[in-house]
């Protein structure tokens, strides 16, 4: 690929505030936005929805037991 056809690097927007991201905190624009995202993960704000399965009786399956 020649230099004439190469596109200059354009940073993607920060997923928290929308400002351009910077290399140091990629994909975020700042330490603050990176910390906001980490806090959302740690407090459960980001979650994957789960469909509860039922057994043959129509009763919900019991949650798996945690090893102690």
UniProtKB/Swiss-Prot annotation:
It holds the Pfam family YacG. Zn(2+) binds at residues 14, 17, 29, 33. Keywords: Metal-binding, Zinc. InterPro entries: DNA_gyrase_inhibitor_YacG, Znf_NHR/GATA. Binds 1 zinc ion. GO terms for molecular function: DNA topoisomerase type II (double strand cut, ATP-hydrolyzing) inhibitor activity; zinc ion binding. One of its GO terms (biological process) is regulation of DNA-templated transcription. Its cofactor is Zn(2+). It comes from the Bacteria. Belongs to the DNA gyrase inhibitor YacG family. Interacts with GyrB. Inhibits all the catalytic activities of DNA gyrase by preventing its interaction with DNA. Acts by binding directly to the C-terminal domain of GyrB, which probably disrupts DNA binding by the gyrase. This is DNA gyrase inhibitor YacG. It comes from Azorhizobium caulinodans (strain ATCC 43989 / DSM 5975 / JCM 20966 / LMG 6465 / NBRC 14845 / NCIMB 13405 / ORS 571). The gene is yacG.
């Amino acid at each position: 690929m020649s230099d004439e056809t190469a596109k200059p690097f354009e940073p993607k927007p920060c997923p928290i505030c929308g400002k351009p991201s910077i290399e140091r905190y990629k994909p975020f624009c700042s330490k603050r936005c990176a910390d906001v995202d980490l806090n959302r993960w740690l407090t459960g704000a980001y979650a994957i929805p789960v469909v509860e399965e039922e057994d043959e009786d129509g009763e919900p399956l019991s949650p798996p037991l945690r090893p102690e």
